[in-house]
Amino acid sequence: MEERYLQLLAREYPNRQAALCEIANLTAMSSLPKGTEYFFSDLHGEYKGFSELMNGASGVIREKIRIQFQDVLTNPQQNQLANLIYDPVKVLSLMHEYGRDTNEWLKNTIFYLTQLCRGVSAKYSRVHVRSKIPHEYDYLMEELLYPGQDEGRLEYGSSIIEAVVSSGLADTFIPQFCKLIRSLTMDWIHIIGDIFDRGPRPDRIMEELIEYGDVDIQWGNHDISWMGAACGNRVLIANVVRMGISYNNFDCLEDGYGINLRPLSDFASEVYHDDLCECFLPKVLDENVYDKVAKSLSAKMHKAMAVIQLKLIGQMVHRHPEYHMEDRNLLEHIDYEKGLYKYNGITCPLTDTNFPTVDPKNPLELTQKEAQLMDVLAASFAHSEALQRHVRFLYSSGSMYLCMNGNLLFHGCIPMNEDGSFERVEVDGEKYAGRALLDRLERAAREAYFLPKDHPDKQKNVDKMWLLWCSAQSPLFGKSRMSAFERYFTKEKALHEEVYNSYYRLSADPHVCDQILKEFGVDPVHGHIINGHVPVRQKDGENPVKADGNLYVIDGGLSKAYQAKTGIAGYTLIFNSHYLALAQHHDYISHPLSKPESDEMPTLQITQKMDKRILVSDTDAGKKLSQRMDELRLLVKAYENGSIVERAIGSYPKTIQSLHMETMEIVR
């Protein structure tokens, strides 16, 4: 096997010199500082807010400007440069509006951008920087970034800037330079769950993540709901449509994903024509741009989907008694004559008793029109090219959890018992706990999407996606129940209560964090748990850093729906070669950029300084580089002892540089 592998490697590095050259390249790469990782959580469709955080690298760009130019630029000038990098088109427009975009200002701006870009690119190889430079300006930008020390070369750089401005290229050159700085500032992005629901455009967030590329995702329960809908789970199709309507997210459903809601609109208008559906009025946090729907009609559509979903949930509960979720089968616990809900010793009146499509003798049966409506919706989800492409990206870049560079990332919880032991959860007749549970559930989620339609295990795994969405034993949910439907139809507070899994209390204990980190093979001395799911009530004094610094909970309320609870507009955790830091964000969307020097920067707090600067060799990528170098050394020995014959580099079409870039993609 080793000889066969070396023969394959020899196709890429056809002689001893080529292999040694790559070993030298990778050795140099290993000695560079690690790139900066950014951790975001619970984006919930807030595309504009997320874009602001991405464009500003969560305040890191502003801090780099302060360090590099504090003796050169005034504070307003530093703000102006930062805002230009965040939103170059907007700032250039404002400068033009104020008559301040003189040639001198443009030349100075390009000069400062060049200086800053040299600073942020210093930790990367030229190959990496070159791969990020926009193609149309690759020659000009590379010449500016690597001028050399010769006086003539310095004058050459000035002449390039002069030529860019005098030829009228500045308005396109500057935005591309800003984009390069932004991309070099953020080496890797972690999304710790819940891209979808509540906010207006999760589809646009997905497009931005796909374009960025260097990203991983730890699935949240709201993500798994959309993934399940894309798999054909009808409970979850009803769920995402219901939730989308409840938050007035018609633009996402219809414009973003092309979901045909006209049959639902017609059905709801007919069935609930004389019902005000007051319990189902949508929460309007954002107005629709492309698909404006009257609140009265939205409420009817909302109720129609809620009732259909309740029927489908009841059917799911009957199909899978092993889920132990009988408390979700609400429609079979209603006394329709008296208008009462009865379950588990609790009897309470319903706030809404108009169920024109429910047969009290067979409450879980869909009417013919409801069944036809679900057929239309299922077809829309199955044939939505954008949705299916986004879900494939969620699968290819996502997982239930991730261990990377000494950190353990997951969205919700590791189910635990009160005594601190890992909860044993039954899946297909076998019990799993801890890491094994998450591995088993991830396998089920992948099989739900990728197994052929006629595979005998396909449907049971598709059904499990609902379990992952809202089961008390789901690591993505981690509450006793999801009481959304009790909130629709009852005022009984006891029925509204959702009790968190013991993990959420126990994980504040450093010893419990150590136990969890060890379970996942992460060093508890230097490792951290990073998760979201539960909004941190910062306004009430809650700290996102828990368990003596072992646990970071970074759901700070980027979602507008939670900002009243948290008091802020989200957190970003930043992990660079020097420290861990938390950026605390303000509501940038309510305070749009009005002048170039506006100061709407996040609060940056360093939470942990590293004992020594972290190098690439200290990271997971560094371990892969080391492994690659070991393989190349074996290849060199094979060339030296003659077991593999050397060839000229010209025998192969690929250059050493292109092979080096491929190697870097492998280790990333």
Provide a role label for each language-model segment.
Residues 1-668:
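Feature recognizes metal-dependent phosphohydrolase scaffolds
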